[in-house]
């Protein structure tokens, strides 16, 4: 199973969500395969959000069993509004299409705890089979 990345993303294990339809596709596919999703909602102009990119990528590299998504709140406003994102960065843990945890703010230790706990509690071991076209 492999996640194919969009052009320009390089070796990143974090998938950038470009539109609402992509969000729905990623969350649905991960849910259908029993994989959790961790989503980072940020903005290109938000320094605290940008400061979390390295840690988020690091977590994605060490947890291939979880689908990591990045959503720019300015580019995908509909999803940001649906989830009630009011500050950046905001991180969501999603399982079976439901938000099970939310962290607001640049707190790398808390995000790591959330990711580590989700990997253990969900007992997933293989990466989601998501293809980005």
From Swiss-Prot:
Gene3D superfamilies the record matches: Glutaredoxin
Q: Give one Pfam hit by family name.
A: Thioredoxin
Q: Report the residue ranges that make up the Thioredoxin domain in this protein.
A: 1-120
Q: InterPro entries from the entry?
A: Thioredoxin-like_sf (IPR036249), Thioredoxin_domain (IPR013766), Thioredoxin_H-type-like (IPR050620)
| Protein family per UniProt | Belongs to the thioredoxin family.
Name-wise, this protein is: Thioredoxin-like protein CXXS1
The record lists the organism as Oryza sativa subsp. japonica
């Amino acid at each position: 199973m492999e996640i194919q990345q969009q052009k320009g993303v390089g070796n990143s294990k974090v998938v950038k969500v470009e539109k609402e339809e992509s969000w729905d596709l990623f969350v649905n596919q991960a849910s259908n395969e029993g994989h959790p999703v961790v989503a980072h909602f940020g903005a290109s102009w938000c320094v605290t959000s940008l400061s979390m990119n390295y840690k988020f990528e690091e977590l994605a590299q060490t947890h291939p069993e979880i689908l990591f998504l990045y959503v720019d709140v300015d580019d995908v406003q509909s999803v940001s509004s649906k989830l009630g994102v009011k500050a950046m960065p905001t991180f969501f843990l999603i399982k079976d299409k439901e938000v099970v945890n939310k962290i607001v703010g640049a707190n790398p230790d808390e995000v790591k705890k959330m990711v580590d706990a989700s990997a253990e509690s969900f007992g997933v071991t293989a990466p989601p089979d998501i293809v980005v076209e």
